[in-house]
From Swiss-Prot:
HAMAP family listed in its UniProt record: NrdR
NCBIfam families in UniProt: transcriptional regulator NrdR
Function, in words: Negatively regulates transcription of bacterial ribonucleotide reductase nrd genes and operons by binding to NrdR-boxes.
Domain ATP-cone: 49-139
Any one Gene Ontology BP term: negative regulation of DNA-templated transcription
Chain residue ranges for the region called Disordered: 1-24
Protein name: Transcriptional repressor NrdR
UniProt-recorded Gene Ontology molecular function terms: ATP binding; DNA binding; zinc ion binding
Ranges of Basic and acidic residues composition bias in the record: 7-24
GN (gene name): nrdR
Length: 155
């Protein structure tokens, strides 16, 4: 494994253990050249998934890109990083086990929306504002009112 600090090719694994959800292996490594320590995560990749963007371009599924977009939606919210990790891992697992080699970007967005719906209303609205391309304050108001309506008890 290449050292992120000096670029040296070899590192030594000092500690290895499964993550909380068991979906990855966390490895503590030390560079053999500069001695820097860093952490890597090893995950099983069941299938290579290609994402079809709105413009028709195709690109490999990028877990880190999905993670960043969810983290941005959850920024400054009382949400534990481990919960975000589980949410992203769950979506990735669904994609890899779906049997499809290609998936529309809009389908991934819908999966994130569905996961965030029961997660945190503010994060849900933030993600929706990008996913649904809100352009005016009225778009936020209309979307927020659907959440409020859904949350009201039936009389």
């Amino acid at each position: 494994m290449r050292c992120p600090y000096c670029g040296h090719e070899d590192s030594q694994v000092k500690d290895s253990r499964p993550t909380e959800d068991g979906a990855a292996i966390r490895r503590r490594r030390q560079c053999e050249d500069c001695g820097a320590r860093f952490t890597t995560f090893e995950r099983i990749q069941l299938r290579e998934v290609v994402v079809i963007k709105a413009g028709g371009t195709r690109e490999p599924f990028d877990r880190e890109k999905l993670m960043r977009s969810v983290q941005i939606a959850c920024r400054k919210r009382p949400i534990d990083g481990a919960r975000i990790e589980r949410l992203v891992s769950g979506i990735q697992r669904q994609l890899e086990t779906s049997g499809e080699n290609e998936v529309q970007a809009s389908q991934i967005g819908a999966m994130v929306m569905e996961a965030l719906k029961g997660f945190d209303n503010v994060a849900y609205i933030r993600f929706a504002s990008v996913y649904r391309d809100f352009t005016e304050a009225r778009d936020f108001e209309e979307f927020a009112s659907t959440i409020t309506e859904a949350a009201r008890p039936i009389k």
